[in-house]
Amino acid sequence: MKNIVIAIDVMGGDLGPKATIEGVAMASKIHPNVKFKLFGDKKKSNIDLDKNPNLSNFEFFHTNESIKSDDEPVNALRKLKNSSMRLGINCVKSMECDGFVSAGNTGALMAISKFVLKTIKGIDRPAIAGILPTMKGQTVVLDLGANVDCTNENLVQFALMGDVFSKIVLGIKKPVLGLLNVGSEHIKGNSIVKQTFEDLKKISSQ
């Protein structure tokens, strides 16, 4: 079985390398077969790497550039092409890594990911997904902040992405599609939500 390789933006998040490297060390203990590629400022990370001597299944790639939480996504995309975030996403693009993790600037993460990785045919926008516990197991909720204004088509696409994610990642054979609304009655919500409800009913019946 092929080893999973995950790229990590060491500089992302409010606490920077300290929290990120601690998190990678915890993950490597739980998943010893996963390899990590860390992208960030080596000098600023050395002290935290030394504090986690059990972290051995990783490579570190140095860069002086990082994206701050208040950087505009467009500027991060155009000007910070050697940032730890950009290099990690490039690693997925080149298929050297299977996934990428960053606790950094969400807007920049979405913008760079869409520019570098693109979206698959039939999907117009990326979405942020979260996995929430339920009485019966788990549910995938999206979008959780990547998009402000959505069309009916966008919402349907998000549902389809959630369906595929549930099947592949969570192992749910027949996910149930739902629509988060202001009420359970089909007459509730604006015109976009109502149309989405009708479209999801058609998809669910197929």
Task: Locate the predicted segments by residue.
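N-terminal phosphate-binding or glycine-rich loops at protein starts, especially the Walker A/P-loop
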Residues: 1-45
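Short beta-strand segments
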Residues: 9, 38-39, 61, 102-104, ...
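Short glycine-rich anion-binding loops that position phosphate/pyrophosphate groups of nucleotides
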Residues: 11-12, 65-66, 105-107, 115, ...
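Short glycine/serine/threonine-rich phosphate/pyrophosphate-binding segments
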Residues: 16-21, 82-95, 99-113, 120, ...
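Glycine-rich phosphate/diphosphate-binding loop of Rossmann-like nucleotide-binding domains
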Residues: 18, 35-37, 43, 148-206
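Short helix-capping segments at alpha-helix termini
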Residues: 28-33, 49-58, 170, 200-205
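Phosphate/nucleotide-donor binding subsite
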Residues: 53-97
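Short, acidic/small-residue loops that bind anionic groups at enzyme active sites
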Residues: 110-145, 202-206
